[in-house]
Amino acid sequence: MPVRRGHVAPQNTFLGTIIRKFEGQNKKFIIANARVQNCAIIYCNDGFCEMTGFSRPDVMQKPCTCDFLHGPETKRHDIAQIAQALLGSEERKVEVTYYHKNGSTFICNTHIIPVKNQEGVAMMFIINFEYVTDEDNAASPERVNPILPVKSVNRKLFGFKFPGLRVLTYRKQSLPQEDPDVVVIDSSKHSDDSVAMKHFKSPTKESCSPSEADDTKALIQPSQCSPLVNISGPLDHSSPKRQWDRLYPDMLQSSSQLTHSRSRESLCSIRRASSVHDIEGFNVHPKNIFRDRHASEDNGRNVKGPFNHIKSSLLGSTSDSNLNKYSTINKIPQLTLNFSDVKTEKKNTSPPSSDKTIIAPKVKERTHNVTEKVTQVLSLGADVLPEYKLQTPRINKFTILHYSPFKAVWDWLILLLVIYTAIFTPYSAAFLLNDREEQKRRECGYSCSPLNVVDLIVDIMFIIDILINFRTTYVNQNEEVVSDPAKIAVHYFKGWFLIDMVAAIPFDLLIFGSGSDETTTLIGLLKTARLLRLVRVARKLDRYSEYGAAVLMLLMCIFALIAHWLACIWYAIGNVERPYLTDKIGWLDSLGTQIGKRYNDSDSSSGPSIKDKYVTALYFTFSSLTSVGFGNVSPNTNSEKIFSICVMLIGSLMYASIFGNVSAIIQRLYSGTARYHMQMLRVKEFIRFHQIPNPLRQRLEEYFQHAWTYTNGIDMNMVLKGFPECLQADICLHLNQTLLQNCKAFRGASKGCLRALAMKFKTTHAPPGDTLVHCGDVLTALYFLSRGSIEILKDDIVVAILGKNDIFGEMVHLYAKPGKSNADVRALTYCDLHKIQREDLLEVLDMYPEFSDHFLTNLELTFNLRHESAKSQSINDSEGDTCKLRRRRLSFESEGDKDFSKENSANDADDSTDTIRRYQSSKKHFEEKKSRSSSFISSIDDEQKPLFLGTVDSTPRMVKASRHHGEEAAPPSGRIHTDKRSHSCKDITDTHSWEREHARAQPEECSPSGLQRAAWGISETESDLTYGEVEQRLDLLQEQLNRLESQMTTDIQAILQLLQKQTTVVPPAYSMVTAGAEYQRPILRLLRTSHPRASIKTDRSFSPSSQCPEFLDLEKSKLKSKESLSSGKRLNTASEDNLTSLLKQDSDASSELDPRQRKSYLHPIRHPSLPDSSLSTVGILGLHRHVSDPGLPGK
């Protein structure tokens, strides 16, 4: 496998560093973006939420001035000081009275700390909140103090804050060249609306040292300590557009002022502004209207008083630094912070303050590192305020990266030295350290033996390696590269230091010159401690065992090395035993006899040579390891035989495990490596085939390598497929237990519900800079961040930074369709995310309705990614889907009804010539039909109420609302046609939209009860309905519509039969109206009761030709209306024309009647769907027109 490099990609560790430093000291802080409007809050820690009572979703995107914490007791001066600190991007500490969410007050020190990037631009603000006790408040009367070191000497305090003032003691008439931004603002004119505090005292001789007085005089004027300064306009030179004096003449009479601070830093109202623009922020009169900085024309030329000197000095400065600062003002990006006015009678509103523009200026020469003041106040480390950017891991000086080329070369060198040690240490201990060699070494010294010199060099190299290990980085458990020398030393001491130290001790130097007889044995035993270096080889086997050829070579070398060690031991046994044997039967004596070099006790140099001894011993061990031996070199003594038995056992194990299973060993050791290389090869082929550019190619390879290291090449889905579902659920529950336990939305869920949820979760790993969600992507999942930090960007502007346990996505239960993302989500560090698909989550919630309500109530998204414009569109889309579903499921086609209508149309066409002559005879029946119609509608109202319980219908609600208010409710009712061929989806949508508008217009009078809302499927809020409830209500609606369809078919046939058999002449206005599709049964009941048999029998002699002309005309047009159903627009136009002509005839005929009869005659003929429908037609709102009914006029 490759070298474990750790997290070496550039990461934005800003959030992690801040949390690590602040959380350890129980800090309460928020982070705001200085480059967006209102300096919106993009992060708040848990301590701030506990202190204020607000949750993180409530605080996100709020202005960093914390207007939601303000109240009547919050002083406007404190708010202005905070705003001024934000305006000038300066550090400041303000004591402010805030309000909890429950309304209680608390006092805390608000510490504003700007965070700047490498260019010195204020990118963010860290605002820390500290509780102020009564003792602290009494001991510290200063309410507004810049952050200073904790010193008691006033001299040092003043000098630390204003180093530029020291220069003024020598240059009285000009501003310091280093910092031209120091300005003096004071005014003796106080107003009640001024933000300045009236209790600040002017400096006196007792409170100011001589140098301080000189500094003060140099800034404000030699003879004055508090001159009157009139500012006729804001001092900005951004965009000369209009004259401030012309727009706001009253501003000339009000001076901007800052009263004296009790602090030594603000003597004579001296404060440091980041630019001359900041003088504008001192005027906080609540009635003055501040304009944007781009609206200024005078460029500060109308400044009066000492500002003339300051302005001229600044504008006339020739210093490059001054001109650079002055020129950057025009390039300042603008941010607006709106401070709302307070109403004293309301408790939770903000104190009054002016609307002004707050801009975080770009001050290049200000240090962006941590100042001494911040570290002393917060007692934090040097990296408390890291730069907000991608930062590579910090490597200390003289620290070696563990994956650097130098370290790789050094490791190979040490490996060769270890191999040398493993070979020559046993050889020298067994063969070379005898009496003859020892005598020679005593005579000529240590340098006579070249092998000893090499051993000395090896020992020195091992000692150097120990020193290098103390400066070599390592990867911790969090996959982070550790470069701190102290941590490296601790890690090395706990690991391999002891082994390396023992192996590096030069024992032969320590015992050199002792001259004892035990020297040889002792040196031989101690030098074998160098074999501990072989542990390094075992430690690095995984690094060098990536290829199969290397494994084979390594196995061969291990086998040969073991044979070498055994040969040394075999010689040592024979050499030690030979002097004590009476019969020379040892293998050395046998070897001397075989080769003709016998041992002579009187001659120490007799016997076989060292070469003969070593080769023979090595031959014996190899033959014993690979087989049972050939017998030419045989063990004779008991010790030799016992050793031979051990060698045979070792040989059988090694032969069987290594040589007999080489292929199996390779497959077992390199199965993951083979998969890694196969996948890597696919990635490289993909890159080469599609010609991926180099930066993107590098990102692909780095991500693949890191993902492989993170998962170790394990495919979780493939592993889980081999287990039963019960074990899969348990494994998933274990993998996601941290999320399910820490997230509040999942608390209280049953074991089965948690197992079902765990099965749906997927874990995603993202490296730094990877974009998880792009703007405009469809939000198909809900994300839970378990490790790392991410940033959310809108138009490349950071709007939020999310950390551990944050949730982002959309509220899936509120919308029928997934929305689109309104921002980009990018990883700042290596992140682990748990995501669940939208459909999977809704499915689990549908299976566990008891958990659904708890989950939807406690689910709080830290950031909602759904696009705002998609919310209203999703409502219409869901209604459209409902209409399509109804149109697909419902069918009002009736073949028998069509045939029946065709026959009636044919019969009525024959009598069309007599319709006009008989029209006048039908007028006297209108009053009678009108009374019948009123009773008909009342009966429908009485019988409709119990029917609609448990169904989803909007008609009763519309009728009831119209009846109460007398509004023109006919259009929505008239639009809903109960055509048997189609059900207009657009009309249903219009009806729902009319209901929503009507409900908003009359929320109290016409709002139905909770039971009626539940019956109609209209919830109080959109989040009350779950997916399962909607499906259940749709099923009930489908059953009701099917039942109504069958009733409608039967009733329409009965109505048509009765209309042709009736003897009374039916007026045209009532023959055109039939019951709607929602409810049809009361019509038949009414018609049966409203036409007595007596009247039918009496008037049975009337022929069809005696009916009203309009009725016959409409009956004749029935067939044509069915044929022209596809052209609805043309049919409606023709119907309106015929109806208009009938109305004209009716008005001519009714001219002979008295006004009372004319009024009763004209009312029923007006149709509710006409634009000029009067309010008297509300009574027939419950009835709907059929396009194919015989009452519709047509050509």
Swiss-Prot record:
Q: Name one GO cellular component term.
A: plasma membrane
Residues of this chain that stay in the membrane without spanning it are found at 615-635
Give the Cytoplasmic membrane side ranges: 1-412, 471-494, 543-549, 663-1195
The residue ranges flagged as biased composition, category Basic and acidic residues, are 976-987
Q: Which residues form the PAS domain?
A: 41-70
Q: Which residues are glycosylated?
A: 600
| SS bond list | none
A Pfam family the protein falls into: PAS_9
Locations listed in the record: Cell membrane
The biological processes this protein is annotated with in GO are: circadian rhythm; potassium ion transmembrane transport; potassium ion transport; regulation of membrane potential
Q: Which UniProt keywords apply?
A: Cell membrane, Coiled coil, Glycoprotein, Ion channel, Ion transport, Membrane, Phosphoprotein, Potassium, Potassium channel, Potassium transport, Transmembrane, Transmembrane helix, Transport, Voltage-gated channel
List modified residues, type Phosphoserine. Answer: 174, 238, 319, 891, 894
- Keyword Ribonucleoprotein belongs to the record: no
Annotated ranges, domain PAC: 92-144
Q: How does it sit in the membrane?
A: Multi-pass membrane protein
- The residues forming a coiled coil are 1027-1054
Provide Extracellular-side residue ranges. 434-449, 516-521, 571-614, 636-641
Q: Where are the transmembrane segments?
A: 413-433, 450-470, 495-515, 522-542, 550-570, 642-662
The record comments on the domains as follows: The S4-S5 linker acts as a signal integrator where it both couples voltage-sensor domain (VSD) movement to pore opening and closure, as well as providing a binding site for other domains that regulate activation and/or deactivation of the channel.
**Similarity-based family:** Belongs to the potassium channel family. H (Eag) (TC 1.A.1.20) subfamily. Kv11.3/KCNH7 sub-subfamily.
What do we know about how this protein assembles, alone or with others?
A: The potassium channel is probably composed of a homo- or heterotetrameric complex of pore-forming alpha subunits that can associate only within their subfamily.
Provide the function of this protein: Pore-forming (alpha) subunit of voltage-gated inwardly rectifying potassium channel. Exhibits faster activation and deactivation kinetics and slow inactivation at membrane potentials positive to 240 mV, resulting in the weakest inward rectification.
Q: What is this protein called?
A: Voltage-gated inwardly rectifying potassium channel KCNH7
